[in-house]
């Protein structure tokens, strides 16, 4: 995923379906991992790759783009992502009740 070469856009405009964009994934600790993905690739692959590199289960993380949660079946094209866009990652928090 991250080793593929980018094809230059012939028209200099919008990305075509087969083209790649670079995405920056930023964790809660401000660590950055860069991914190069196709516009039509389901973001499930990026999520799985990120969680594998971090050594945590993918279901323990929440991925957000522009404040909206990213589901597995979405693609960068569907989300209107562009080169160098940022995906934020947060640890899933469960439980937590107040004791009064």
From Swiss-Prot:
Location of the protein in the cell: Nucleus membrane; Nucleus speckle; Cytoplasm; Nucleus, PML body
Protein name: Small ubiquitin-related modifier 1
Major site of localization recorded for this protein: nucleus
InterPro entries, A to Z: Rad60/SUMO-like_dom, SUMO1_Ubl, Ubiquitin-like_dom, Ubiquitin-like_domsf
Maturation propeptide residues: 97-100
UniProt KW keywords: Cell membrane, Cytoplasm, Isopeptide bond, Membrane, Nucleus, Ubl conjugation pathway
SMART domains listed in its UniProt record: UBQ (SM00213)
Family according to the record: Belongs to the ubiquitin family. SUMO subfamily.
Subunit structure and binding partners: Interacts with sae2, ube2i, ranbp2, pias1 and pias2. Covalently attached to a number of proteins.
GO cellular component: cytoplasm; nuclear membrane; nuclear speck; nuclear stress granule; nucleus; plasma membrane; PML body
Originating species: Danio rerio (Zebrafish)
One GO MF term attached to the UniProt entry: protein tag activity
PANTHER family: SMALL UBIQUITIN-RELATED MODIFIER
Domain Ubiquitin-like, first and last residues per copy: 19-96
Post-translational modification as stated in the protein's UniProt record: Cleavage of precursor form by a sentrin-specific protease is necessary for function.
Pfam families, per the entry: Rad60-SLD
Function: Ubiquitin-like protein that can be covalently attached to proteins as a monomer or a lysine-linked polymer. Covalent attachment via an isopeptide bond to its substrates requires prior activation by the E1 complex sae1-sae2 and linkage to the E2 enzyme ube2i. This post-translational modification on lysine residues of proteins plays a crucial role in a number of cellular processes such as nuclear transport, DNA replication and repair, mitosis and signal transduction.
GO terms of biological process kind: cellular response to cadmium ion; cellular response to heat; chordate embryonic development; definitive hemopoiesis; protein sumoylation
Cross-link (Glycyl lysine isopeptide (Gly-Lys) (interchain with K-? in acceptor proteins)): 96
């Amino acid at each position: 995923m991250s080793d593929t070469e980018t094809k230059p856009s012939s028209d200099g405009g919008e990305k075509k379906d087969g083209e790649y964009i670079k995405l920056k994934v930023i964790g809660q600790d401000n660590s950055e991992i860069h991914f190069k993905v196709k516009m039509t690739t389901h973001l499930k692959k990026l999520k799985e790759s990120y969680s594998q590199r971090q050594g945590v289960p993918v279901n323990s993380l929440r991925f957000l783009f522009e404040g909206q949660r990213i589901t597995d079946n979405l693609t960068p094209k569907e989300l209107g992502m562009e080169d160098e866009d940022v995906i934020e990652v947060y640890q899933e928090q469960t439980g937590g009740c107040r004791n009064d």
